[in-house]
């Protein structure tokens, strides 16, 4: 399912117009993104948790030259599914 299909599903199940469903979906994504940018954790009970995880610096290789290089530490978004979502998928 892509974003357009998600918007269509939200519009159909909620009775919203596609324009309003688009605004709602975008607002949810923007809210989650902003919370993660601030370093907050987003907990949606039953669905799952969005959080920012730290990746440690590590050694890697340039695939073109084979030269060893240092990959700097970074932050990455992560999602951990909740119990209800896990059970629904089984």
UniProtKB/Swiss-Prot annotation:
Residues 56-90 are annotated as: Disordered. It comes from the Bacteria. One of its GO terms (biological process) is chromosome condensation. One of its GO terms (molecular function) is DNA binding. SMART domains: BHL. One of its GO terms (cellular component) is cytosol. Keywords: DNA condensation, DNA-binding, Phosphoprotein. InterPro entries: Hist_DNA-bd, Histone-like_DNA-bd_CS, IHF-like_DNA-bd_dom_sf. The modification Phosphothreonine is found at residue 4. Belongs to the bacterial histone-like protein family. Homodimer. PANTHER family: DNA-BINDING PROTEIN HU, DNA-BINDING PROTEIN HU-BETA. Histone-like DNA-binding protein which is capable of wrapping DNA to stabilize it, and thus to prevent its denaturation under extreme environmental conditions. This is DNA-binding protein HU. It comes from Geobacillus stearothermophilus.
């Amino acid at each position: 399912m892509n974003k357009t299909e998600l918007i269509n599903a939200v519009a159909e199940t909620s009775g919203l117009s596609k324009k309003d469903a688009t605004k709602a979906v975008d607002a949810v994504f923007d809210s989650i993104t902003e919370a993660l940018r601030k370093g907050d954790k987003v907990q949606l009970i039953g669905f799952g948790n969005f959080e920012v995880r730290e990746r440690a610096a590590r050694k890697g290789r340039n695939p073109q030259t084979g030269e060893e290089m240092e990959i700097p530490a970074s932050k990455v978004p992560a999602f951990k599914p909740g119990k209800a979502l896990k059970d629904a998928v089984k």
